[in-house]
Every structure is written in C-alpha cells, then in structure tokens.
Amino acid sequence: MRVLSALLASTALLGGCATPPAPDGPPTGGNSNDCAVIAAIAREHYRFNSTDNRPLPIRFEGDYAPRCDWSRYGLAFQPYDPDQPGDPRERVRWVSFARPVYDGRGAVVETSIMHGPLAGMGYECRVVSGIAAWTVPEGACRNTWVS
C-alpha cells in the first residue's frame, strides 16, 4: 500500500511539472523585462531624456524587435529608418540594442551608438534588478569597439 501511495504521489508531482503554461501566461518568445532593461541603459548610460538629450533613432540587432511603450519609461524613441529622406548624414545616427541575456545577477546587453560617419562606440552593459527598477551600476558598461 505504501509503495502504491508513493507511486501515485510521485506521478502527480511529475505530471504537474510537465504541464504546459496556461494560454494567458507570459509569452515564450521574449522576456517582459527587456523593455525596462533597455530603458535603464538608455536613461542611465546614454543619459537620454525627453528634454535636452533626446534619444537617437532606435534599432535592434538581427530579428530581435521588442514592442515597447517607451513613454512609460520617459523616453521618446523613434524607429531607425535607413531609407529616411533628407540629409544622408542623419541616416548614420542611431542607437542599437541586442537581446538582453539574463543570468543570476541581472542582464547583459550589447549596445552601440552612432553619432555620424565613423563616430560610434559599442558597449556591453550589465544591468541589475533593484527594488523598484532595473539599474545600470556606475562602471557597468565596458567599451567593446570604437570607430
């Protein structure tokens, strides 16, 4: 009888682990923290704001394209358009972000900024989750390339 009870209990536990998430659960294709992590880098590393240092057009690496409500984070990003009409020098001004990689300490994000032809820098930024928000500790972004 004990063996049967133990077998039934372990079967129920294993079955619960194998149950897929409910349809209204979080999406599996991305992380709901991505927008907040990117916004933290934009505000704290690049010092973008809505008044005197407005963000450059934003672009993402590869097929990564999170849908974010940037105004929620006090930012006003416009999407990068390489075919934008007008001054061609404006088409080489952008900030880009790769998909955040999460670990036990927070997230790491590859990011870069181009201010114009041959005037850009790449970084790898460590972002940590604080009590109220994601933050970029002082010195947590290291240069990865310069043009």
Language model: regions and residue ranges:
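Sec-dependent bacterial lipoprotein signal peptides
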Residues: 1-17
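Residue-level signal for the start and early helices of compact helical domains
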Residues: 5-8, 86-91, 125
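Flexible low-complexity loop/turn motifs enriched in small/helix-breaking residues
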Residues: 17-121, 140-147
